[in-house]
Amino acid sequence: MMDMQVRKVRKPPACTQCRKRKIGCDRAKPICGNCVKYNKPDCFYPDGPGKMVAVPSASGMSTHGNGQGSNHFSQGNGVNQKNVMIQTQYPIMQTSIEAFNFSFNPSVDTAMQWTKAASYQNNNTNNNTAPRQNSSTVSSNVHGNTIVRSDSPDVPSMDQIREYNTRLQLVNAQSFDYTDNPYSFNVGINQDSAVFDLMTSPFTQEEVLIKEIDFLKNKLLDLQSLQLKSLKEKSNLNADNTTANKINKTGENSKKGKVDGKRAGFDHQTSRTSQSSQKYFTALTITDVQSLVQVKPLKDTPNYLFTKNFIIFRDHYLFKFYNILHDICHINQFKVSPPNNKNHQQYMEVCKVNFPPKAIIIETLNSESLNNLNIEEFLPIFDKTLLLEFVHNSFPNGDTCPSFSTVDLPLSQLTKLGELTVLLLLLNDSMTLFNKQAINNHVSALMNNLRLIRSQITLINLEYYDQETIKFIAITKFYESLYMHDDHKSSLDEDLSCLLSFQIKDFKLFHFLKKMYYSRHSLLGQSSFMVPAAENLSPIPASIDTNDIPLIANDLKLLETQAKLINILQGVPFYLPVNLTKIESLLETLTMGVSNTVDLYFHDNEVRKEWKDTLNFINTIVYTNFFLFVQNESSLSMAVQHSSNNNKTSNSERCAKDLMKIISNMHIFYSITFNFIFPIKSIKSFSSGNNRFHSNGKEFLFANHFIEILQNFIAITFAIFQRCEVILYDEFYKNLSNEEINVQLLLIHDKILEILKKIEIIVSFLRDEMNSNGSFKSIKGFNKVLNLIKYMLRFSKKKQNFARNSDNNNVTDYSQSAKNKNVLLKFPVSELNRIYLKFKEISDFLMEREVVQRSIIIDKDLESDNLGITTANFNDFYDAFYN
């Protein structure tokens, strides 16, 4: 006999339900046979925590199981593809579900409806989970991966938070390739969240972290709004208890020898202190959670204070206006056409940069157009001599178009080719914007060159960067701020990374990097949180002549003041009491500085001013004053019930001052723009037949800033316009005021309408004078402004009908507007007359009445019931109001 060593084979662990019942498990996933038999939906197989999941291949991801085929994930066209490995912190939840058990409705583009016979959830974590779902229908977002849903509308469960797909693949909404597999949208459900997050991505760990920080900031705002709601409820409860105690303890106070009058005085002081603690800065937050849903697909921008979207969610009238727009689009079922990315895909396939012939480049660099442009004035780190020397030495002779492989080139040549590319694009933009003389046959190739060179440089380790590389990054970020061509502008701060990583001894380069970083963020109202505001701009040595570098030297003190103001606004704890004195003090300093600067340069015949800074300051002043206006207006409505007439008068006066500051700074903006950037003299001479625009070639530097700020000011002007217009159709507001106030409001209403029509004429003229080449981003921006004004005027014409016929009366019916929210009705007649005269001053400056009558734009769809929105023009409408 032979002794045979027998080894007992350990069976794999069963599911949790079979372990409990101590019965055999067939290990069928996602639900084993026993659990199906006993109708146990919480069947799952726990895996060890911290398990690293295998990374799928770059070509796609295949899954095999019951009824599962292969799913392919589109990886995009990025050059730098790196795997972002993320280890799971929780046991991996098995969420493999048969694709054939789901139904997909392609007509719904914002959400997908998934149906299954029985839902299940993972109860293996130690965190608090949501109640068990027994419904047969599970709703999930198109980018969602969670099966567990919380019954609470305010607080998500821990499983929900764990299953939020915050990785860049979901946040950036990478395109899926629907041509390979009609069920490719199941890629996030057929695997667990960790597998999906570990897919090959063309992005770096730093980019992923930045996106996740933005996500967490939004979650923080949600938590803060919940805290605000809780604090308000507690304060109301405490106020009720205080009133009850005062009534119940009157006898007790008398026994203690307290006189009623003295006691009443003490109670009044306590009440006043309690009210002062309720002075939240609500103009910067959204107190109504439902507002985020009511104006879809508009997205809130809590990290960008100076944008249209930010004020639309926080102003009562703009918010209702967008609700009506949403109703119109929802009723008519308009759809946005998909973008065409064929050219971008074609360029990214070849890693070669192509340039015009050497002779053309040298002729361009020595041309009179480049000398007249005086590029060193706004780009002080540019050196034309070194660039010409590089072209002579590196480019082959002949009439052929040279090409270079970005993979084989050293870093020094890459950066020089990048600087040359940006210079040619700058010169092309300056020539083609109005003069129509540019040779734009190579523009697409140059844009492709810039993308490829930047992508190749990002693959190089930061420690190998030299000063020329940093200079190229700075020049590229400057060109990016002009936003002429690039639809996919980078939001990363590569220039700031260079500032923090290197000790840059070149003064011009050092301050140019800081100036560009700050200007880029301040235009949108972003705080420079990565570098303290006090350290953003260092003093200029006395040995350097500031007149030689106007782009860097101008308004350093005002830049520091603006940085402090934006940082305070970004850091306002709106759920706690806030003192507005510091905000108003910085705002006053910035306003006085801009006023002095404008007066100085308006009297200077040789204007060498970098006007982008001043436009940026004015944008900050107008937005901050509008926040204060909305804040004081909301405080006034609360004061009707809880405060004395003195407080109401005080808030009304503050609103009047804020509104006058808004209008005055808008006037300064139009004066600067149409005197120095786009001279309006030719527009005023329409009546004489002289309709030529006199360009100096530098308008392209300011086109993007002008368009962005103009759109903001149009939205704010329309908010004031609606406050005046409300008396035309709402009897409630009309009865709140007397006849004299109503007359003044109608005068302001007509004058704002006149201003909007004049701006429409001017912008239309500027657009027509530009090159008809649609590739210019600034021209598209001018079209957005025209569409904004056009649909606003149509809405004003038909607003009364919209107020009566709205389907959702609780949301969009203007006849049910919140009471006492229109502070203009509380202004004295003298103050309203001052506002009217200020608007009249702007209107008279823009254009004469005779010119308006000759150049008026006739809108055939002015009386249209749905604002003239059709399938053909819906893309333009959507781009103007929602992008």
UniProtKB/Swiss-Prot annotation:
Main subcellular location of this protein, as a coarse class: nucleus
GO molecular function, one term: zinc ion binding
Localization: Nucleus
Protein origin, superkingdom: Eukaryota
Entry keyword set: Chromatin regulator, DNA-binding, Metal-binding, Nucleus, Phosphoprotein, Transcription, Transcription regulation, Zinc
Entries under Pfam families matching the protein: Zn_clus
Bias (Basic and acidic residues): 252-270
Summary of subunit composition and partner proteins: Forms a heteromer with RSC3. Interacts with NPL6. Component of the two forms of the RSC complex composed of at least either RSC1 or RSC2, and ARP7, ARP9, LDB7, NPL6, RSC3, RSC30, RSC4, RSC58, RSC6, RSC8, RSC9, SFH1, STH1, HTL1 and probably RTT102. The complexes interact with histone and histone variant components of centromeric chromatin. Component of a fungal-specific module (HTL1-LDB7-NPL6-RSC3-RSC30) within the RSC complex.
PANTHER family (UniProt xref): CHROMATIN STRUCTURE-REMODELING COMPLEX PROTEIN RSC3-RELATED, OLEATE-ACTIVATED TRANSCRIPTION FACTOR 1-RELATED
The name this protein goes by in its record: Chromatin structure-remodeling complex protein RSC30
Species whose genome carries this gene: Saccharomyces cerevisiae (strain ATCC 204508 / S288c) (Baker's yeast)
Name of the encoding gene: RSC30
